[in-house]
Design a protein with these regions (language model features):
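Active-site ligand-binding patch in enzyme domains
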Residues: 154-158, 162-171, 175-304, 313
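Residue-level signal for inorganic ion chemistry
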Residues: 20, 38, 89, 129, ...
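Short, basic/aromatic recognition patches
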Residues: 12-32, 155
Length: 316
């Protein structure tokens, strides 16, 4: 009977953790420098489990998901279970540690998915909970959580963002026709998927060749998600991007970063800066922007996921 009971509880834990992971996707790409985390507060008063509080990391990274969920649950959090997609924080920052908040609210059981590699947290969040007498169950749907949090985990461990290359090829292995601007290769379903990838990324990166050839805006165009456009990054060692480019036209709405090398015309750079364009001065290697160093710079800016949509030179 005990084994059956454990099996039932494991199924319940997986079901609510899956729901918490779906919730955490809501603000992917909008919570830097923090990851987008989902939290559910679930209690069972004898009639079956019921969600009494939910939270996702707010835009900008604060408040944390746990605080939002506890605020929604109120007194119903006492004696309840919290499902968290990432180990609760254990350090004092702009807000008190979420591990303490969960324990102080009377949560009696915490089910976690991914462990936090941040040395300020790593294992300490769960230790605080256990010391307070809270039952802790770790690594429920950990593989799924790690995949969703890959950008944050990679940035924490390797000091660089997760990089995803989007590349469309024709049946003969071509990505476009030189001098003919944008060429449509993919179908509607693939284009919509790319829009979702953009909406969940911290930044989109292209080379100056693509910027000059296609004059893209690199914004999210799915209805209802237009405000989810991530920062745009252009690899432009010599600052050849025209001030009339679409990327510059809407810089007041969507950030634009240009990675340049040394020796850029200061007056031309100042003109872009007056428009609101931000510059990343980075090293060059063999005449091109040094990507490893640039990735470190982007991670330092809090970017955890970068979608590369450049052409053959950048992709290579």
């Amino acid at each position: 009977m005990a084994a059956a009971s454990n099996s039932v509880q494991e199924a319940i834990d997986r079901r609510y953790m899956a729901a918490a992971l779906r919730l955490s996707r809501k603000n992917l790409g909008r919570t830097a420098t923090n990851p987008s985390v989902g939290t559910l507060i679930v209690r069972d008063d004898g009639a079956g489990p019921m969600i009494v509080g939910s939270g996702v990391t707010a835009i900008g990274g604060r408040p944390h998901a746990e605080a939002e969920a506890l605020a929604g649950a109120g007194e119903l959090a006492r004696g309840a279970t919290a499902y968290v997609t990432l180990e609760p924080c254990a350090h004092h920052g702009r807000t008190p540690p979420c591990a303490h908040a969960l324990a102080n609210a009377g949560i009696t059981r915490v089910v976690g998915a991914a462990s936090d590699p941040d040395p300020r947290v790593s294992g300490k969040g769960y230790a605080i909970l256990r010391a307070a007498g809270v039952e802790v169950v770790e690594k429920v749907l950990a593989e799924e959580a790690n995949a969703q949090l890959a950008g944050y985990l990679i940035r924490s461990l390797s000091k660089r963002p997760e990089v995803t290359l989007k590349l469309a090829l024709s049946s003969d292995g071509k990505i476009g026709r030189r001098g003919q601007g944008q060429v449509t290769i993919t179908g509607e379903i693939a284009r919509r998927e790319v829009q979702m990838m953009r909406a969940e990324a911290d930044a989109i990166l292209i080379g100056i060749g693509t910027a000059l050839e296609d004059d893209p805006a690199l914004t999210v165009r799915l209805p209802g998600l237009e405000n989810r456009s991530p920062a745009r990054i252009v690899l432009d060692r010599d600052l050849r991007l025209p001030e009339t480019a679409k990327l510059v036209a809407d810089v007041d709405r969507v950030p634009l970063h240009i990675a340049v090398g040394e020796g850029v015309d200061p007056q031309r750079k100042a003109a872009f800066e007056r428009r609101g364009v931000r510059f990343i001065a980075t090293d060059t290697h063999d005449g091109a922007i040094a990507l490893p160093e640039l990735m470190e710079d982007l991670a330092a800016l809090g970017m955890a996921t970068v979608l590369v949509e450049g052409g053959a030179v950048t992709a290579g």
